[in-house]
Amino acid sequence: MIRLALFGSGVSSSLSPAIYRGFAAKRGLRLEYRVYEAGPGGLAPALRMAGELHGFNVTKPLKREALSLASTLDSHARAIGAVNTMVAGEEGWEGFNTDWKGFLDSLKLYTASPPDTALVIGAGGAGRAAAYALATWGAGRVLIASRTGLTARRAAQDLAGLGAEVEPVPPGGLEDAAAASDVVVNATPLGWDGVSTPVERGFREGCIAVDMVYRPLATPFLRRAAASGCTPVDGLWMLAIQAAENIAVWLGLEASPVELRTYALEAMRGGRG
């Protein structure tokens, strides 16, 4: 039995279990993927409660916290300063970041060229991964916004030197930053409730708006962006692509993001997680 898990806040609504169970069932694999609620400082206790695992994912707010549990880090996790995937190794947990790849490849479904200016809203692990992906892809300027500005400034400092100008958005400057950006990314939890959005207005016509929130698919953020003439990219593509990357890390197998997305959509239609 291959035992996998997801740790984080609000994980009961995650579609990850449906994705991995669907993949395993199609291939006749004996695999379980369970979710464990864990808040700040709660990863290590939750891991002990879960028992022996082959690997696991972490989501908000644990992606930075998970760094301290890794015996080794891949180059992306080290540069981003966040982990979302772990696999058991000979000397302990090996940490990976597959979020950046999930984000970047989902964006590349809609554009072949890096943006001149991109705005990432949210400076946690997911936001850092998006900013890293944009900077290393060749974006000219990457703006990072956070609620207080403190984590945005820290992320901008940590991600400097990747080939792009990485700058924090000053307090009160979010709408101006959105208006100046070719790509706008929501890397916050705002939208899970189907009501909230980090940006009410200010989208530049013709921009690409990427939401890491995938439930609902048409989030308030994406609806407002579409109404302003922007191309919306739902968060389910990122989830499916990074899941394919995780399967390669954990099992050494190839997986189609299109197939994995189908399992998630089936679960959404059936009201399952």
From Swiss-Prot:
NADP(+) binds at residues 122-126, 212, 235. Keywords: Amino-acid biosynthesis, Aromatic amino acid biosynthesis, NADP, Oxidoreductase. It catalyses: shikimate + NADP(+) = 3-dehydroshikimate + NADPH + H(+). Pathway: Metabolic intermediate biosynthesis; chorismate biosynthesis; chorismate from D-erythrose 4-phosphate and phosphoenolpyruvate: step 4/7. Pfam families: Shikimate_DH (PF01488), Shikimate_dh_N (PF08501). Shikimate binds at residues 14-16, 59, 84, 99, 214. The active site is at residue 63. SUPFAM superfamilies: Aminoacid dehydrogenase-like, N-terminal domain, NAD(P)-binding Rossmann-fold domains. Its EC number is 1.1.1.25. It comes from the Archaea. GO terms for molecular function: shikimate 3-dehydrogenase (NADP+) activity. InterPro entries: Aminoacid_DH-like_N_sf, NAD(P)-bd_dom_sf, Shikimate_DH-bd_N, Shikimate_DH_fam, Shikm_DH/Glu-tRNA_Rdtase. One of its GO terms (biological process) is amino acid biosynthetic process. Involved in the biosynthesis of the chorismate, which leads to the biosynthesis of aromatic amino acids. Catalyzes the reversible NADPH linked reduction of 3-dehydroshikimate (DHSA) to yield shikimate (SA). Homodimer. Belongs to the shikimate dehydrogenase family. HAMAP family: Shikimate_DH_AroE. This is Shikimate dehydrogenase (NADP(+)). The gene is aroE.
